Amino acid sequence: MPTYKSLTLILTIALMTVGTATADVTKSDQKQSAMETMKIATISKMYQQDIDEQGMSNPAVLQQYANTELQAAMTLEQAYFDKNQMSCNVDYDVLWDSQDPDYTQDKKLSMTEQGLVQVSLAQGSDIYYELSCDDNDKDCQIADVILDDDGKTLRKHLLEACR
């Protein structure tokens, strides 16, 4: 009989441990899902503002949603323009991957496995955003925009080209 009680005790402890591990995984999945929802909501809000203002926001809508590092790179670009009367920025609207954006085109927002927000535009372009989020404020900011398949980013481009 003591063996039976020992076995029951071991099984009970094992099931409690599995239950706790499952709860931790569920909490982690929920936190990940909430973070993804926050990221997509931020990008969706940014695009809606750009559509509403037809790209005429001042400062630019991307700068309004950027974190401090990306804002600093964008400020560097403005200083370069003021000094040299020429742009060191990319020569198109990054949000729409176009020089003449179609604000009415359909777009689809999704998450990549790398945690980037992907915006797939009806014109066939995909734009990828890296966001930094603060759990406490339920707020996300754009840390960078991936410009090409080689992984070149807007922030890196501005820091290199606008010196």
Where in the sequence are the language-model features?
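Bacterial N-terminal signal peptides that target proteins for export
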Residues: 1-8
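Hydrophobic/aromatic beta-strand elements that line small-molecule binding cavities or substrate pockets
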Residues: 127-135
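Low-complexity, intrinsically disordered terminal/linker segments enriched in charged
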Residues: 112-114, 125-126, 144-163
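Sec/Tat signal peptide C-region and signal peptidase I cleavage site
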Residues: 19-23
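Short, aromatic-enriched amphipathic alpha-helices that serve as compact interaction elements
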Residues: 31-57
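Bacterial N-terminal signal peptides
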Residues: 8-17
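Short, well-ordered alpha-helical segments enriched in acidic and aromatic residues
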Residues: 55-83
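Surface-exposed, charged secondary-structure patches
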Residues: 24-27, 74-125
